């Protein structure tokens, strides 16, 4: 790897390659590429709940239709919202919610890289004023069973949806 160019990007303005200085120096011209509705836009993977995860190919027309229908009608995303879908990139659910629905609606997609821990999730929902939450039913069950559930307040949370497995009536 000795012939590779290596550099470090940092938020620290005092280093040679700070993120902000690289963005400011970058070419502002974007060369667009013509695509058709039938061209492949995404390849993501199903959760594997009912078997081995499967690659799912989606076309540009699907992504557009998703933004136009699901963001508004299923998640209830508004442009001023903070949306947290806990699925990891690469999984089908991540494409649906934080990527297409949130960003395609002009909302903010909240990202948390840590492991699931019920109290941490509840604290983040409160602290970051999450408006739209999409978790797996297992995550919801664990949060509701958490002793700290009632100690947090969720006045901003307007929509909570799930995907990936059945959601039992007790959680709802």
What are these regions (language model features)?
Residues 1-37:
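ANL superfamily adenylate-forming
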Residues 1-5, 107, 155-158:
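A short helix->loop->beta-strand "cap" motif at the edges of active sites that frequently abuts
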Residues 11-13, 87, 114-116, 130-172:
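Adenylate-forming
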Residues 38-39, 78-82, 155-156:
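Short acidic capping loops at alpha-helix termini that bridge into adjacent secondary structure
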Residues 40, 46-49, 83, 125, ...:
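Conserved S/T- and glycine-rich ATP-binding loop of Class I adenylate-forming
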Residues 41-68:
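Conserved AMP-binding A3 loop
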Residues 49, 106, 164:
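Conserved G/P- and acidic residue-centered "switch" motifs that form tight phosphate/ATP-binding loops
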Residues 64-85, 89-132, 145-146:
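Conserved AMP-binding/adenylation subdomain of ANL enzymes
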